[in-house]
Amino acid sequence: MNKKLAASATMSVAMASAETRLSENITLLGVLLDKAILEVEGEEISRKIAAIRQAALRFHQTHDQQASLDLEQLLAGLSLEHTVRVVRALAYFKHLVNLAEDLYGQQLGHCQQNTPAPGMLSYTLLQIKEAGIPADTIKHLLEDALISPVLTAHPTEVQRKSVLDIERLIAELLAARAAMVSERQLARNTLLLQGAVSALWQTRMMRYSKLSVLNEIENALTYYESTFLHVIPEILQDIECDLADVLPDAALPGFLRMGSWIGGDRDGNPFVNGGTLRESVRLQAITLFKFYLQELSALKRELAVSTRVVGVDDAVLQLSKTSRDQSQHRLDEPYRLALNGIHDRLLATANTLLPQGGWVLAEDMAADPYETPEALLAPLQTIADSLRAHQGEALIYPRLGKLIKAIATFGFHLATVDIRQSSDVHEAVITELLQKAGHDFDYAGFNEDEKIGILLEELKQPRLLFSPFQQYSELVHKEIGVLVAVREMRERFGEHAVRQYIISHTETLSDLLEVALLQREAGLLRGVWGSANIQVDLNIVPLFETIADLRDAPMIMGHHGATQRHGDGQIRLTEQGEIISTRYADPVVGRQHLETLIAATLDATLFPADQLESGKRRAFEGVMETLSATAMTSYRSLVYETPGFAEYFFNTTPINEIAELNLGSRPAARKSTRRIEDLRAIPWGFSWGQCRLLLPGWYGLGSAIHHFLQQDPALKEARLAMLLEMQAHWPLFNTLIQNVDMVLAKTDLIVARHYAHLLEDRELREEIFSRIAQEHKLTTDAVNLLLGTTQRLATQPVIAKSIRDRLPYLDPMNHLQVEMIQRYRNGETDEKLKWAIPLTINGIATSLRNTG
């Protein structure tokens, strides 16, 4: 008990120290930014920025009306040029605060490592060992497991690589500062930080031109270079070490694998095609081979083990003979010589697979390329086995073990690129292929049973529909061209280069069969459909995107064997927008997030938190169904059934500016309409966040709970008890309420009303805003009732403090955004407006730390 108390006391001191450093770092970064602004912009604008920040902070601390008036007067008196400077200052300050908070999160994580808690990977691994789970069960779970973060690009991506690079440097300097003790060290660190902050201020935050798909590919690769290539092998190796007493001599399978939609996601993006897919896979492979070659070069320097000191396996001696380096000075260093030969062969592999990769080959190099990643792994494993057998176990962990894990995980492809297209595009392509193949009917006009019959019959035919001698539309050539590119990339870089074909808007079985038929046209489906020898290269993955389609999904999934199904311990999830930079720009933060993801997946499989007995579960699910139906009715009534709601949305949010002002390669909507149904989910949510309503995150819950409790007064008390029991004992419901609590903490109806005035139709504006305000009150009351407090995020004080600290600097940006959007829509043509509006979008997204 004394040890536990001592550990707890030590952790409390460490956490207090981390909080002190957070405050000091934020103050320091603010001072450095002020200095950078003063040097570049001069005293006048520097004073205005300081006055605005102080007035905003004073208003939020005291809610003083005079402070509010002072702030409004300061903002109203800004010229457009000064507005740009103020927005940049507020936005960059929040960027810097985010860096300090990320470091604080890392330090808290370090404090907790000695006392593992639920949700941490160390805690989960400890539970696995203490639970006495049979080794075979653990082994089979890990062999079947798949945890795959999938990086995506979206219309709301607002970060520039140049800015991310500088911020990464600032984060590194802040982290180094924490370990410094001498005044000289701290002074030098401060000078370096000042240089980085000044560089940040003098760097353009936003791009002049629209982001291309190639830009998005290159941006994503920076996270592999900084984080994934290093962190994922480390995690896998450390898990293997932690479980060594449970799974002795068992090599941990590479269950943590990266995915990407960038370069392969065609749904609504006309700029993605076979060429972008090839370039995505190619650039990934170049990044990967450069990493492998760098690691091998480092190993050659490090493993100068001499046979004059220790023994070595004969297999390593044989490998050493493949080296071009036969210097007399290194004849007793077989590991180094063997690695030299492996390096040459890997370089030959890179040059074969990527002839335009800029590889430098020695004139006397005559090494054969490796055919597969497994062929590369074999000699490295031979070296590891020899080291292990000859007192060299400690030499494996620092680099060789991680390189082996990296190759087993990343292969020759780095990340699996998914391809995605909408089901209506597939239908159009199949219709044209059938017509050009001589079928005198309109496939698109048939009912579902007729379509299934035609598709199954075609899948049994040995001939292809597509003919090189026929003329097709650009759409057909593009879609077939993408699948041909898939086949080429798989043949060159292995089957993991492209594995999934995702179908947006899946509604029926024919949507899946159409993709099977298209795969056949490109050589990705072989054999006779329905027979034992059928081979389908790409998993056909449906996306069910409406309530009705989700309810019909079991019928579709049950009929189609090629559909990808995920069992226990498997999850693929998309990471997009600012979430990628928030989670993965820093390798320490990236590791913490990946460990949390692994822990959650293993916990859900081995130690499910939901231990409800069946009767109680059915009762809870019945209540949830009732709440869901009422919430959906309320939400749809507002969004889809209220006359003028689309006009309200398009006028009172920055959705049009997001679509126009260079925020990504992908259009914000699938079609050029002003229909809610045609919007993408991410811009929809992003736009509501910008105007501080975050409506999709909470609207409908209040009505659902209010109706559930008030429907029958005689049952109100019992129903409330049921909801409180669900909140206390059902993780699903608890998480739902906690998430809504967080969204409400970021919502501000006073700010949102400013945006509402962008709509000139006063009657429509008041009608819709009043409905939103009424539902907001119902939802706030419901969450307060279930959580037993009126304080937002009472159980998450760190997040609550972070949000509270952001609001003073967020409100002025919202105010300025409304003003500039109004001027832009009124026809002002000053280029500074087009420059300033995206700055506010970036600053607000950065402050909210989400993009929808």
Locate the predicted segments by residue:
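Often metal-dependent polyanion-binding catalytic scaffolds in large enzymes
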Residues: 2-456, 473-475, 569-852
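Short glycine-rich or small-residue beta-strand-to-loop segments that form or flank ligand, phosphate
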Residues: 91, 383-386, 501-504, 540-543
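Extended, compositionally biased low-complexity polar/Lys-Gly-rich tracts
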Residues: 203, 538-541
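Structural motif
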Residues: 233, 261, 499-500, 541
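Active-site cores of enzymes that catalyze phosphoryl transfer or operate on phosphate-rich substrates
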Residues: 344, 348-355, 416-417, 422-513, ...
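Extended, hydrophobic alpha-helical segments in both membrane/secreted and soluble proteins
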Residues: 515, 540-543, 552-553, 596, ...
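A conserved P-loop NTPase coupling/switch region
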Residues: 532-537
